UniProtKB/Swiss-Prot annotation:
Record-linked Pfam families: ELM2 (PF01448), zf-C2H2_6 (PF13912)
Zn finger residue spans: C2H2-type: 512-534, 1019-1043, 1092-1114
Region (Disordered): 201-226, 270-317, 332-351, 390-500, 527-583, 601-629, 956-1016, 1043-1087
Lineage of the organism: Eukaryota, Metazoa, Chordata, Craniata, Vertebrata
Ranges of residues in domain SANT: 891-942
Modified residues (Phosphoserine): 490, 961
PANTHER family in the record: REST COREPRESSOR COREST PROTEIN-RELATED, TRANSCRIPTIONAL-REGULATING FACTOR 1
Modified residues (Phosphothreonine): 773, 960
Subcellular location field: Nucleus
Residue ranges of domain ELM2 in the record: 785-876
Keywords carried by this UniProt record: Acetylation, Activator, DNA-binding, Metal-binding, Nucleus, Phosphoprotein, Repeat, Transcription, Transcription regulation, Zinc, Zinc-finger
Protein name: Transcriptional-regulating factor 1
Subunit organization: Interacts with CREBBP and EP300. Interacts with DNTTIP1 and DNTT.
């Protein structure tokens, strides 16, 4: 009764806490969004300590309930209460869970809630921790016995039984062992937070019971309640926390639990079929959470070890209970809150990691108690039966209970979980007594053992006990579980607790290992994609526990019992378990021990059949078909070295989980059965598949009756199965009838209404005959390889005939147009040619642009040449708008004014043939018109060249003045050079006209003037028909060599009178100002700033590079001249010096003096310039200029002109 009263007191504290739990817990469950974190923390802290059920917290701590809830770390206490009180975990949900859990579950939930609340919400004093440690040894044994005894009782006990259990627990708390039990219970509720998640799933109906007093007896409560509550706390983020807070108020808790259970059911799609295992992991989690909550501040003493242990426990719990994913924030808060109080306990757990395991097992039991409906919890467990689902993982743990639980207890994860659940008194007790640590391992093993469905979990004493006390952490994780992702079992929550952030981050060290090739992967999606390379089958991912994995094997339903034999301390055993399971190629199964935030891919493998919370969509979906958010992210705690090393790992922040793109199902090509390939060797190992396009049937009777019947066309069978799984035509039809995550044996034919046809052949290539008898409902198809013969496949080639037969054949082509016979007459052809020539002359406006118009006119005149000529001589006829050629544009018919032509020439000289810039300068014409004008002029120039050639008989050496491009070695007509700007532009516009006779062309200033050459200092060639102008005598001398190499007497004129140029003479191409092919006019029309005349010879270039190349010839000439001048000067000085000498020239003694005197003249020769050379006047032109240089000069000019054209 005393205990019961204490329990009631705790309930009062919890009731206050429950109220506060209803508020978002700021301290512990801030992440969970519950208020019980702050306000409850104070009350909860006091209540758990005072509660008789929580051995960790002395009853004087219960007295602390009176303290303001906000004053103490109530958030932590709430978490612990939730972990400790199955009903308290969620004010309504936990109470319902207790009621649903059965008497033992309720009992466990009640004591656990009280103590976990203390663990989670209160940073209980170290004295209480020490007390719990001292009591650990005896309490652990009692807890173990309680867990074993009350495992079944939890399933049976109802709300009334829960009350009795509370009383029993309070009575037990009176003694030292009772206090130890309380401590264990209080710690376990923290881990129960993890297990509470599973219990919440399974025990949702049980928790609705309003009173914890009616729950399980105290002994069962400590073992199961703590872990389940902690788990439930995680599952029911807000509701579970409230329920754990409401451990003192059973009535309020059931209501809240009911609501939370609904949430949990919604969230926890994957009920874990083995609630006991889940409870075991949850108990560990709850213990860790309680320790963390109690020792958030105390974690400092042994942070590395405790964190490592917490990670190990969290990993185990996460592997066992996926609920940790969702309640990660709560787990973090619980750990933080528990760690201060658990500060002393973590060392004990670190000392004996096995102790953590028992506590973890209690946490799992508490979770089960905390979880509202056991069946719901069981479903999550079933869902987590896969390696990826913590709940199923719990079931696996239960099956593996001995090896796995011991291993986990030995693993640092177990201590980490206990340390993270600072509430757990078992941690303290474990420190005090190693036997108690083993008890804890046993208890944890018991919760892990229940691989049963939710009902099976309830049947298990430990499992039910775990389920009864919905630890706030466990409940919270289940709140996260609604996301369809296992949280309690998630490595995030486990590692997150160790780090202070429960489920938020994944352990970067956690990796998944392919069970076939042992390749490591960082995430489940990556592993799933890799498994496609192994035949498209999904193997349960082997989670590589690198840092002392505590997570149970990730394998699906098969629970690796190899872990059971493994010693509890060695963390490595779990990985071996994973490979064995992984070896079994089952449809992608999530390992229960692997913390996963994922919807179970296969309900059967996860024990989903019993899961109520799991949505049907989640069950049906294959793992690969999940959305990116739903894709599981598996991280298994690595095998941890010594605890010290593992302590450092928990400190590391886990990398945030990454979203993985959905990957399509692997290509699955079903091999053709032997019945469909009777003689596969006939195709040299190739397999035959039935074509889905067509399957012509051969009816034997019809062939016998109608021998003339043609065989159906032979189509080679497809090399790949036309019904292979993929995104093709039949993919949806084939996949719809099969379960998710499984690669069904696809039929060889698609599900089409047509009957299946049997592929067979009467004979094969190798000569072997195979007789195939079609089965019932099957029809044979002739697939014997053959060449299809017939009119449909081959053309009949007629016999060769004589070529003369072609004359008899009538042309089958349609006659479109046939010319008149007269057009073939030569005389008529000549008339048409003459007409076109006339049209291109100056007789008609438009000149050469009239050729097309002339042909159109001739067509309209129906071939009458005279009528066409009359039409052309008259004004342009006005065509009707309906005329086909009314809007036709004849090339060259545009009107260009003198200003436009001038601008065009200037732009063409500046930008060459970049007509976009040319048009910008002309502005009044379009780019198309500028292009047309340029090429029309080019065409006219060629025509004009021909006409000039015919008219050049009266002119000696007359050559057409074409563009430098075509003028190459020809000299431009001086008449063209002397044309006025207007005449030249008009010629460009109307170039079709033959150029007027040279005699008619008025003589104007030479192009050099137009170019802008200086009037003075010009040297003009006096040769007949030349008149080339040069700026220097050397240039003129070089030019004179063209006229026979004789020296020409050059005249220097200030101005070159136009009359001195002979009309008929041709101007040298070198002197021609019109070096640009674009100009038919004098260079005077061009902008002087855009031309580059040569200062030596007067040649004009439109590109600086062309002039620079040309100047090299002058430099070479000048260099030769300088050398010759130097020689001449040196010779003259030598002669003068010799004459001045007194002695004989050849006197040896004077030679040195002579040499010295000659040094200065030699130096003077070096500075001689062109003027000095010219003054010497002793050099012949032939000596100064070489023929090869002149040729080079010509070539350079011509090339320059060509490039511009």
């Amino acid at each position: 009764m005393g205990d019961q009263q204490l329990y009631k007191t705790n309930h009062v504290g919890h009731g206050g806490e429950n109220l506060f739990y209803q508020q978002p817990p700021l301290g512990v469950h801030s992440g969970l969004g519950h208020s019980y974190g702050n306000t409850i923390s104070g009350a909860g802290m006091d209540a758990p300590q005072a509660s008789p059920i929580s051995p960790h917290f002395p009853q004087d701590t219960r007295d602390g309930l009176g303290l303001p809830i906000g004053s103490k770390n109530l958030g932590q206490m709430d978490t612990s209460r939730q972990g400790g009180w199955g009903s308290h975990a969620g004010p309504g949900n936990h109470v319902q869970l207790r009621s649903n859990l059965a008497n033992s579950n309720m009992m466990w939930g009640t004591p656990t809630q009280v103590e976990p609340a203390d663990g989670y919400q209160y940073t209980y004093s170290q004295a209480s921790e020490i007390r719990t440690q001292k009591l650990t040894s005896g309490v652990l044994h009692k807890l173990d016995s309680f867990t074993q005894v009350f495992a079944n009782q939890n399933l049976r006990i109802q709300v009334n039984n829960m009350a009795q259990v509370l009383h029993t627990q309070s009575a037990v708390m009176d003694g030292a062992s009772d206090s130890a039990l309380r401590q264990l219970l209080s710690q376990k509720p923290v881990e129960p937070s993890a297990s509470a998640i599973a219990s919440r799933y399974q025990q949702v109906p049980q928790q609705p019971h309003p009173g914890f007093t009616g729950g399980l007896p105290k002994p069962a409560l400590p073992v199961g309640q703590h872990a389940p509550q902690g788990h439930l706390y995680y599952d029911y983020q807000q509701p579970l926390a409230q329920m754990s807070m409401q451990g003192g108020q059973p009535l309020q808790a059931p209501q809240v639990l009911s609501g939370h259970m609904q949430q949990l059911q919604q969230h926890q799609y994957y009920p874990q079929p083995p609630p006991q295992q889940q409870q075991a992991g949850l108990q560990r989690i709850s213990v860790q959470e309680m320790q963390q909550q109690q020792q958030p501040q105390q974690i400092r003493p042994s942070p590395p070890q405790q964190q490592q242990q917490l990670q190990l426990q969290q990993r185990q719990s996460s592997l066992q209970i996926p609920q940790y994913y969702q309640p990660q924030p709560m787990m973090q808060h619980l750990q933080e809150q528990q760690q201060p109080s658990m500060h002393l306990q973590p060392p004990s757990y670190h000392r004996d990691p096995h102790q953590y395991t028992p506590e973890q097992a209690h946490a799992v039991q508490l979770i089960q108690l905390g979880s509202m409906p056991q069946y719901y919890y069981q479903e999550p467990q079933q869902a987590y039966s896969h390696p990826l689902y913590p709940q199923s993982h719990l079931s696996q743990h239960q099956q593996r209970e001995d090896g796995q639980l011991k291993t986990y207890s030995s693993d640092r994860q177990t201590p980490a979980m206990l340390s993270s659940h600072g509430d757990m008194g078992t941690s303290d007790t474990g420190v005090a007594d190693p036997a108690s640590s083993e008890m804890t391992r046993v208890t944890s093993t018991l919760p892990h053992q229940p691989l049963l469905s939710p009902s099976g979990i309830h049947l298990n004493n430990m499992g039910s006990q775990h389920q009864q006390p919905p630890s706030p952490s466990a409940m919270w994780p289940q709140m996260h579980l609604p996301d369809g992702r296992a949280q309690s079992g998630s490595p995030e929550s486990s590692s997150g607790q160790t780090k202070g952030v429960f489920g938020e981050q994944f352990d970067a060290k956690n990796k998944l290992t392919c069970s076939i090739c042992l390749k490591e992967f960082k995430s489940l999606p990556a592993l799933n994609g890799h498994m496609r390379s192994h035949g498209g089958m999904r193997a349960s991912p082997s989670l590589k526990q690198e840092e002392g994995e505590k997570a149970p094997p990730p394998q699906p339903q098969p629970q690796p019992q190899p872990q059971q034999p493994l010693p509890p301390p060695p963390p490595p055993p779990p990985p071996p378990q994973l490979p064995p399971e992984a070896e079994r190629l089952t449809p992608m199964v999530m390992p229960v021990s692997v913390p996963v935030k994922l919807i179970p891919p296969k309900p059967s493998s996860q024990g989903f059949t019993n899961s109520v919370a799991a949505t049907p969509a989640a069950r049906d979906k294959p793992a690969s078909s999940m959305s990116d958010d739903e894709m599981p992210v598996l991280e298994i705690p690595r095998k941890h070295p010594p605890i010290a090393a593992k302590v450092e790992e928990p400190l590391k922040n886990l990398p945030e989980k990454k979203k993985f793109r959905h990957r399509p199902e692997p290509l699955f090509i079903p091999p053709p059965p032997s019945s469909y390939t009777p003689n596969p060797t006939s195709y040299s190992g190739a397999t035959l598949y039935q074509s889905q396009l067509r399957s012509p049937r051969i009816l034997g009777d019809h062939l016998l009756l109608d021998p003339a019947h043609e065989l159906p066309p032979y189509t080679p069978p497809p090399m790949l199965s036309p019904v292979r799984q993929g995104s093709g035509l039949f993919s949806n039809v084939l996949i719809s009838g099969h379960g998710p995550g499984v690669h069904p044996q696809l039929p060889l034919t698609p599900l089409t209404p047509t009957p299946r046809v049997l592929l067979c052949r009467s004979s094969s290539i190798d000569g072997s005959n195979v007789t195939v008898t079609p089965g019932p409902g099957e029809q044979t198809v002739d697939v014997e390889p053959r060449i299809n013969i017939g009119l449909r496949f081959q053309a009949e080639i007629p016999e060769l005939q004589d070529v003369s037969a072609l004359a008899q054949d009538t042309h089958r082509a349609t006659l479109v147009w046939k010319p008149w016979p007269e057009l073939e007459n030569q005389a008529l052809q000549q008339q048409v040619e003459n007409l076109l020539n006339l049209c291109c002359s100056s007789a008609l406006p438009g000149g050469g642009t009239n050729s097309e118009f002339a042909l159109h006119s001739l067509f309209e005149a129906k071939g009458d040449v005279m009528a066409t000529l009359e039409m052309l001589l008259l004004r342009k006829p006005v065509r009707l708008k309906c005329h086909p050629l009314a809007n036709y544009h004849y090339a060259g018919s545009d009107k260009w004014t003198s200003l436009e032509r001038k601008l065009f020439n200037k732009a063409l000289a500046t930008y060459s043939k970049d007509f976009i810039f040319v048009q910008k300068m002309v502005k009044s014409k379009t780019v198309a018109q500028c292009v047309e004008y340029y090429y029309t002029w080019k065409k006219i120039m060629r025509l004009g060249r021909k006409h000039r050639t015919r008219l050049a008989e009266i002119i000696d050496d007359c050559m057409t003045s074409e563009e430098e491009e075509e003028a190459e070695e020809e000299e431009e007509d001086p008449e063209e050079d002397r044309k006025s700007i207007k005449e030249e532009e008009s010629e460009v516009a109307k170039s079709p006209e033959p150029p007027p006779a040279p005699a008619l062309a008025p003589t104007e200033g030479p192009p050099m003037q137009a170019v802008g050459q200086q009037p003075s200092g010009n040297f003009i060639c006096e040769m007949p028909n030349c008149g080339a102008v040069f700026s220097s005598r050397q240039a003129l001398n070089g030019h004179a060599r063209i006229h026979g190499g004789t020296n020409q007497v050059a005249k220097t004129r200030g101005a070159i009178p136009s009359g001195k140029q002979k009309p008929g003479g041709t101007q040298s191409g070198y002197c021609s100002v019109k070096s640009s092919p674009s100009h038919s006019t004098t260079s005077g029309e061009t902008d002087p700033t855009t031309i580059f005349p040569c200062k030596e010879c007067g040649k004009v270039f439109f590109k600086i590079k062309s002039r620079n190349a040309h100047m090299k010839t002058h430099r070479q000439q000048e260099e030769q001249q300088r050398q010759k001048a130097q020689k001449a000067a040196f010779a003259a000085e030598m002669a003068a010096t010799i004459e001045r000498t007194t002695g004989p020239v050849g006197a040896p003694e004077l030679l040195p003096l002579d040499q010295l005197s000659l040094m200065k003249p030699v130096k003077d020769v070096d500075i001689l310039d062109d003027d000095v050379v010219q003054q010497l006047g002793v050099m012949d032109e032939a000596e100064v200029v070489g023929t090869d240089l002149l040729l080079d000069d010509q070539d350079s000019v011509l090339l320059q002109g060509d490039t511009e054209l």
